[in-house]
């Protein structure tokens, strides 16, 4: 057991410590720090305050417990507090057990005892997170680096949990620290916390062929309407809208766009949305009422008669025929009376607007013409009377022809006298006439009387068949009802007089129109071998490329519009459409105003070259419509409805001379527009 120390020397040893403690306390009170700094540095400052005592303590420890063997009470006198004593003394005994008593003079014992008061040896703090370890009275304090916490500085501080660590966008926590980053499309600013947009469009290759638009944090590659961006190819590729089923009927895709087509021949056109179809309806009312007491002579385009009568009499009988007649047609057959073509007969016809009589008696034929011009559209009464040796033709009761004849029209056969009478045609081919004539006659007959007898059979037939009836009121012109067409075989190539020079071509069209509907083909060329439409002029109620509803006249080669011109198609007035095409030139005019070209100069030359190639092969000229062609063959395939006269290459087209004409088209008469309601 260690010898006890006397009180006197111990008290003397504690006096300097007390004096230093009072001085240190005075200094600590004089220095005032902010709360945060005081918290961080309170423990280190306490450590420094005890530094003098620690040095003194180390000297006492050397004398009391290293050079000599000390008791717990003596150790308490060295440390002057229980915590450090409680920490020191058990370990002091461990040093004795390990190295022997102080009296063995083992250097390891001295080192072991001298290190026991420093609780930072060995360092209990986490090496990674600790800035310094501070020894305290029986304890220690770990001063943590920024970003670390906990008693041993081994706990990471999550700076991102408070106000996102001060980062504008993304905060990344990591052991002992953190860093800011930005979303895609942004880059970190020099302050390390805020973000600024990256202009991806500064790179010319960002979108390749497409237009680049910078966006906050991103960018977009833009294409024109009708195109979609391909990120793999970095290019704009056409969108096939037809695969999306946008059109009600026929869809045609084109680069950046598409067009819908409707069955024009079926009476349909594009509706307002340019995708669906609607009926083509009249926009101008025409006076198409018909008279049940009239007989239309032009119904049969073939020239065959509209009425055939056969009279049989027991006694010799003479022909008497009277009727009212109206026409604008200058040529055609009114009636035939007689036997077969090699026997006796007469034909009453019109030529150049005047009555003409062809007759054949006993194999001898004659032709005579006389009287006023009667194709003025007014009603007049015409009569044919067979006398003993004469034929008398009267107009409005005035005799215009009196012709001596040798024989009778009624011919005896098997005990009866026979007479064939046909109206609007002859019972044989017109080439067998005395003088050939176009038999087709757009004329109207009423109040007919044959052989002074009442003809109820014909009247009843006409009454129930509107196609045999005439319009109640007509004007000069040709009427297209919207249900058919006519066509001609015309040649548009011209060979110059100079031998050896190349042939040239020309297409000039003048159309006088008074439309009843806003859609329909006025004029067109058709190549039968290719089933193509080399040229067309038509009314249309929309602009195909602008997808805008507008009343227009369109001039096109095949499906490509060369020129467009606005027209007030539904005003009930007559308009003049003029078209001129030749090598290097294509013009369209409406009422003297030139239309707008829809193609470049190079495209025009290419289209005209296509037209010329077609003109060097057989083509047919169509009026009022097209044959059964694909709806994509031309901008318009619908039939025209309204009045129209056509002049082609300075020649007036006579529908009676067409190679074909729909029976509902009237060649030389047209109903007027109905007067506006009062």
Swiss-Prot record:
Residue positions binding Ca(2+): 329, 331, 440, 656
UniProt GO cellular component terms: cytoplasm; endoplasmic reticulum lumen; extracellular exosome; extracellular region; extracellular space; Golgi lumen; platelet alpha granule lumen
Domain Gla: 53-94
InterPro entries associated with the record: cEGF, Coagulation_fac-like_Gla_dom, ConA-like_dom_sf, EGF-like_Ca-bd_dom, EGF-like_CS, EGF-like_dom, EGF-type_Asp/Asn_hydroxyl_site, EGF_Ca-bd_CS
Chief localization: secreted
Recorded consequence of changing residue 620 to A: Reduces affinity for AXL 15-fold and decreases activation of AXL
Tissue: Plasma. Isoform 1 and isoform 2 are widely expressed, isoform 1 being expressed at higher levels than isoform 2 in most tissues. Isoform 2 is the predominant form in spleen.
Signal peptide interval: 1-30
Glycosylated position list: 420
UniProt modification remark: Gamma-carboxyglutamate residues are formed by vitamin K dependent carboxylation. These residues are essential for the binding of calcium.
Compartments, as annotated in UniProt: Secreted
In-chain residues carrying the UniProt-annotated modification Phosphoserine: 71
Domain Laminin G-like residues, every copy: 298-470, 477-670
Gene Ontology biological process terms in this record: activation of protein kinase B activity; animal organ regeneration; apoptotic cell clearance; B cell chemotaxis; blood coagulation; calcium ion transmembrane transport; cell surface receptor signaling pathway; cell-substrate adhesion
Keywords in alphabetical order: Calcium, Disulfide bond, EGF-like domain, Gamma-carboxyglutamic acid, Glycoprotein, Growth regulation, Host-virus interaction, Metal-binding, Phosphoprotein, Repeat, Secreted, Signal
Result, substituting residue 310 to E: Strongly reduced affinity for AXL. Abolishes phosphorylation of AXL
Cysteine pairs bridged by disulfides in the record: 65-70, 120-133, 125-142, 144-153, 160-171, 167-180, 182-195, 201-212, 207-221, 223-236, 242-251, 247-260, 262-277, 283-570, 444-470, 643-670
MF annotations from Gene Ontology: calcium ion binding; cysteine-type endopeptidase inhibitor activity involved in apoptotic process; phosphatidylserine binding; protein-macromolecule adaptor activity; receptor ligand activity; receptor tyrosine kinase binding; signaling receptor binding
Transmembrane region(s): none
Assembly and binders: Heterodimer and heterotetramer with AXL.
Function: Ligand for tyrosine-protein kinase receptors AXL, TYRO3 and MER whose signaling is implicated in cell growth and survival, cell adhesion and cell migration. GAS6/AXL signaling plays a role in various processes such as endothelial cell survival during acidification by preventing apoptosis, optimal cytokine signaling during human natural killer cell development, hepatic regeneration, gonadotropin-releasing hormone neuron survival and migration, platelet activation, or regulation of thrombotic responses.
Stated name of the protein: Growth arrest-specific protein 6
Species for this entry: Homo sapiens
């Amino acid at each position: 057991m260690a010898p006890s120390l006397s009180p006197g020397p111990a008290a003397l040893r504690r006096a300097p410590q007390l004096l230093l403690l009072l001085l240190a306390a005075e200094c600590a009170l004089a220095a005032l720090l902010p709360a945060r700094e005081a918290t961080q540095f309170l423990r280190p400052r306490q450590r420094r305050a005890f530094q003098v005592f620690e040095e003194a303590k180390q000297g006492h420890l050397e004398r009391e417990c290293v050079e000599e063997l000390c008791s717990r009470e003596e150790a308490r006198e060295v440390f002057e507090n229980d915590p450090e004593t409680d920490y020191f003394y058990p370990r002091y005994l461990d040093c004795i057990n390990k190295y022997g008593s102080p009296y063995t003079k083992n250097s390891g014992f001295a080192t072991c005892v001298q290190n026991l008061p420093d609780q930072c040896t060995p360092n209990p703090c986490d090496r990674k997170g600790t800035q310094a370890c501070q020894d305290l009275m029986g304890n220690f304090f770990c001063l943590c680096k920024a970003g670390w916490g906990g008693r041993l500085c081994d706990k990471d501080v999550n700076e991102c949990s408070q106000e996102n660590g001060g980062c504008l966008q993304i905060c990344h926590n990591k052991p002992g620290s953190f860093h800011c980053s930005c979303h895609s499309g942004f880059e970190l600013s020099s302050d390390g916390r805020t973000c600024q947009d990256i202009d991806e469009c500064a790179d010319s290759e960002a979108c390749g062929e497409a237009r680049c638009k910078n966006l906050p944090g991103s960018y977009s590659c833009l294409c024109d309407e009708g195109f979609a961006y391909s990120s793999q190819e970095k290019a704009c590729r056409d969108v096939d809208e037809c695969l999306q089923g946008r059109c009600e009927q026929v869809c045609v895709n084109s680069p950046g766009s598409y067009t819908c087509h409707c069955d024009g021949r079926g009476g349909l056109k594009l509706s307002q949305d340019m995708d669906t179809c609607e009926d083509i309806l009249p926009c101008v009312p025409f006076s198409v009422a018909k008279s049940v007491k009239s007989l239309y002579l032009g119904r049969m385009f073939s020239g065959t008669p509209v009425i055939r009568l056969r009279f049989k009499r027991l006694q010799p009988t003479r022909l008497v025929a009277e009727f009212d007649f109206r026409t604008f047609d200058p040529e055609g057959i009114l009636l035939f009376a007689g036997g077969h073509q090699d026997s006796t007969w007469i034909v009453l016809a019109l030529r150049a607007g005047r009555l003409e009589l062809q007759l054949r008696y006993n194999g001898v034929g004659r032709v005579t013409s006389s009287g006023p011009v009667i194709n003025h559209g007014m009603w007049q009464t015409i009569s044919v009377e067979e006398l003993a040796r004469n034929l008398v033709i009267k107009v409005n009761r005035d005799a215009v022809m009196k012709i001596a004849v040798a024989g009778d029209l009624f011919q005896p056969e098997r005990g009866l006298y026979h007479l064939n009478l046909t109206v609007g045609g002859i019972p044989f081919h017109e080439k067998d006439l005395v003088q050939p004539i176009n038999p087709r006659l757009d004329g109207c007959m009423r109040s007919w009387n044959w052989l002074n007898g009442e003809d109820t059979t014909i009247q009843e037939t006409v009454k129930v068949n509107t196609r045999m009836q005439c319009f109640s009121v007509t004007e000069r012109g040709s009427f297209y009802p919207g249900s058919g067409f006519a066509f001609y075989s015309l040649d548009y190539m011209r060979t110059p007089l100079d031998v050896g020079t190349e042939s040239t071509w020309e297409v000039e069209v003048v159309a006088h129109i008074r439309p009843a509907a806003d859609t329909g083909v006025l004029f067109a060329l058709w190549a039968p071998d290719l089933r193509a439409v080399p040229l067309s002029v038509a009314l249309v109620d929309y602009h195909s490329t602008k997808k805008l509803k507008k009343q227009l006249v369109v001039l096109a080669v095949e499906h490509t519009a060369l020129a467009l011109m606005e027209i007030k198609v539904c005003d009930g007035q007559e308009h003049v459409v003029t078209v001129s095409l030749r090598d290097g030139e294509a013009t369209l005019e409406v009422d003297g105003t030139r239309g707008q070209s829809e193609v470049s100069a190079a495209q025009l030359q290419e289209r005209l070259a296509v037209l010329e190639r077609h003109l060097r092969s057989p083509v047919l000229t169509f009026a009022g419509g097209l044959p059964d062609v694909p709806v994509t063959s031309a901008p318009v395939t619908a039939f025209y409805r309204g009045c129209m006269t056509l002049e082609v290459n300075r020649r007036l087209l006579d529908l009676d001379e067409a190679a074909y004409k729909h029976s509902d088209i009237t060649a030389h008469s047209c109903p007027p527009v109905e007067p506006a309601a009062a």
